[in-house]
């Protein structure tokens, strides 16, 4: 997903993890794995997602292929597609999507990929797929197929269940604590 989560990096990354889980499950991945890209806020995001996990939210962290392991991923984890879901902030995700979809064209045309994903959020009932003016025909065709897969996978029902489970595990408390800490600083 891109740009729909939060203007706060850590809050956005936490929400992006949940949105990624929703999307993966709607696409048929029953137990998706989550990795966190090694960007500013990754360790705090990991800590908060593990709090959700300890609260009972079913989140499965992947292990980096690097010798130091852990769920915080480096660039090789991106290229190897180590996790099903690579969590990052929305701006980094946008840059990553553009680079990976247009590297064969020198950046002028997005020739591969599925666009920038669906807009996912709590209470959403309309599916909006995101593409850009540089998205080529293959990307647009893939985005349409992706949208169909999400609809067949009942993305809104999956979202309702995941948000309910995340809230039961303490999502609202975690997000309000993050907000309070931001306001103090």
Feature roles, as predicted:
Residues 73-172, 181:
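Glycine-rich phosphate/nucleotide-binding loop
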Residues 1-27, 32, 126-154:
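Short, glycine-/small-residue-rich phosphate/pyrophosphate-handling segment
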Residues 6-66:
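Glycine-rich phosphate/diphosphate-binding loop of Rossmann-like nucleotide-binding domains
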């Amino acid at each position: 997903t891109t740009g729909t989560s939060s203007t706060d990096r850590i809050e956005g990354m936490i929400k992006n993890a949940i949105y990624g889980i929703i999307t993966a499950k709607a696409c048929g991945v029953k137990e998706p794995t989550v990795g966190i890209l090694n960007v500013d806020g990754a360790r705090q995001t990991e800590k908060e997602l593990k709090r959700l996990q300890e609260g009972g939210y079913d989140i499965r962290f992947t292990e980096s292929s690097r010798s130091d392991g852990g769920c915080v991923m480096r660039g090789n984890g991106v290229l190897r597609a180590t996790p099903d879901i690579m969590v990052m902030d929305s701006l980094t995700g946008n840059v990553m999507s553009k680079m990976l979809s247009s590297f064969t064209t020198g950046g002028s045309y997005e020739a591969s990929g599925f666009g920038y994903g669906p807009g996912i959020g709590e209470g959403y009932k309309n599916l909006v797929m995101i593409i850009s003016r540089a998205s080529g025909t293959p990307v647009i065709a893939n985005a349409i197929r992706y949208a169909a897969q999400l609809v067949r996978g009942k993305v809104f029902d999956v979202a309702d269940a995941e948000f309910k489970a995340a809230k039961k595990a303490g999502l609202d408390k975690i997000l309000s604590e993050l907000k309070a800490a931001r306001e103090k600083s």
